[in-house]
Amino acid sequence: FITKLSALYMSKNPAKYYSKNNLNTKPNAKAVILFTSGSEGYPKGVVLSHTNILANYAQVRCHINFNPTDTVFNCLPLFHSFGLNAGLLMPLLGGGKIFLYPSPLNYRVIPELIYELGATIFFATNTFLKGYAHYAHPYDLNTLNYVIAGAEKLHVDTMELWMHKYGLRILQGYGVTEASPVISVNNKMLNKSGTVGRLVSDMEYYIKPVDGIENGGLLVVRGPNIMQGYLSHHKLGQIEAPATERGLGWYDTGDIVVVDDDGFITILGRAKRFAKVGGERTGR
């Protein structure tokens, strides 16, 4: 059901009109353009192709198996890649049901709806997960098989609260809009607390040294899920493909990370938030 609607577009053309005219869509055609927040400059238009999105779905499915028996509860905004790609498109591709709720802020209502719907998969951020846990009754969340956190650091107290109160282990992942969005994720079999999991399949990475940081460096990645590029600010309609000193296709995440011997990634912070003090860089 729809509880809130700010606008509704009604087309005169039947759905089959759009289906017929999209049959010739090329795999590398633009599927969606999502804009970054602009927290470190101007917002950037991230161009993702159909191939990018489908590749990331295949990568994530190796860790989280979306299937037709699942019901996904998604209250995240669809103008963000976490809410759109992970919370909507991936479950749709898996054939499951999806319940979209307009706001993640209703801490009392959302757990009740999860119970009523029998939801099995839930996407949220640390902030919201902590809020739900303070209001939800233990039985409200007993249908959930997967609780997946992203978009911000998952705190230890949030993880412990969910485990002790509901017996649910939160799986933390890591992604960026430019990667459609998932780069790494923990799963039920391979899960290391404090990390964002291991790199998804078919991705390469290297750690770029940063002056003043001995343990860790910049994470640079490449794979079929990496964006086509950014919309050019200078040349209308053109796309600036990702590239580093190693060539085209490599994307510098801007995140300082440590990768352990088992391949689990720990995020130390954004590179631009590290200050050099006494010859060493420390997070601010």
Task: Mark where each language-model region is.
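Conserved AMP-binding A3 loop
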Residues: A31-A55, N186
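Adenylate-forming AMP-binding core of the ANL superfamily, especially NRPS adenylation
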Residues: M10-K12, K153, N186-N187, N191-K235, ...
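Conserved ATP-binding/catalytic segment of the ANL
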Residues: V220-R284
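Conserved structural elements of the adenylate-forming
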Residues: N13-P14, Y18, V46-N67, C75, ...
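Conserved S/T- and glycine-rich ATP-binding loop of Class I adenylate-forming
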Residues: K30, T36-S39, V72, L78, ...
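Gly/Ser/Thr-rich phosphate-binding loop
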Residues: A119-A124, A133-N191, E204-Y206
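Conserved pre-ATP/AMP-binding loop-to-beta segment of ANL
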Residues: I2-F35, Y42, N65-T71
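Conserved AMP-binding/adenylation subdomain of ANL enzymes
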Residues: L54-T71, F79-I121, Y135
